């Protein structure tokens, strides 16, 4: 049976070594597998859910992310790389799916709850951010993805997608939507620590070694890295 894989990144900043170890390296391997079709999305619409006040940041980083993809070995002749906003049908499908999901169900997503807390939204949660797991479901099902690689923290998102698929097929009594399988990282998979030693390498914390960094930038960052005095 052939596999259809959907994955991607939000263009909120340049990609770093943590992205390479965590997902990009695996995508390059997947594109070379037999009977595997892979779609990689630059999720600019999703990036706007918490960057609506700075759209230029998102626009500028679309190109940066695309260049990073090519630099690590993603081959456009083997992998379909696309920009989310260039396919308006995804937003349309998201609107239909929103009618199948209750507010209480959205509240129960532990990943979204944690992200809302981390971003300190308080009571001012953007509706687009609160509902972005539904948008992800639209992206996944539109391409009839059979497998979706995610980290442990993103597992609740895929569970939400699977619920939407089951509900849609049950309500309309047709197996129209494909139920995607979750691909989790290996148990020994390690996250890279940021150069400041304060948690994982992160775009938002600006503590990464970026794929586009110059040799001098990399050397300077390595020399300043936090090390255990013991």
Task: Give a label for each model feature.
Residues 3-138:
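N-terminal Rossmann-like or analogous alpha/beta NTP/dinucleotide-binding catalytic cores
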Residues 113-230:
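Active-site cores that bind ATP or allylic diphosphates and position pyrophosphate for catalysis
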């Amino acid at each position: 049976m052939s596999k259809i894989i959907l994955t991607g990144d939000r263009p909120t900043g340049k990609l770093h070594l943590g992205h390479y170890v965590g997902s990009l390296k695996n995508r390059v391997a997947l594109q070379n597998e037999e009977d595997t079709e892979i779609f990689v999305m630059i999720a600019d619409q999703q990036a706007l859910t918490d960057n609506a006040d700075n759209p230029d940041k998102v626009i500028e980083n679309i190109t940066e992310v695309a260049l990073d993809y090519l630099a690590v070995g993603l081959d456009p002749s083997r992998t379909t790389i696309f920009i989310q906003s260039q396919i308006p049908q995804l937003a349309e499908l998201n609107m239909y799916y929103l009618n199948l999901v209750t507010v209480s169900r959205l509240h129960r997503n532990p990943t979204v709850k944690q992200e809302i807390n981390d971003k300190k939204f308080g009571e001012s949660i953007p509706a687009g951010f609160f509902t972005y797991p539904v948008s992800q479901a639209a992206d996944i099902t539109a391409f009839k993805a059979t497998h979706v690689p995610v980290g442990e923290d993103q597992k609740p998102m895929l569970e939400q997608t699977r619920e939407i698929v089951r509900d849609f097929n049950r309500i309309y009594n047709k197996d129209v939507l494909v139920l995607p399988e979750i691909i989790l990282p290996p148990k020994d998979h390690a996250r890279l620590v940021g150069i400041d030693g304060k948690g994982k390498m992160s775009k938002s914390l600006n503590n990464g070694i970026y794929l586009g960094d110059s040799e001098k930038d990399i050397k300077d960052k390595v020399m300043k890295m936090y090390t255990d005095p013991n």
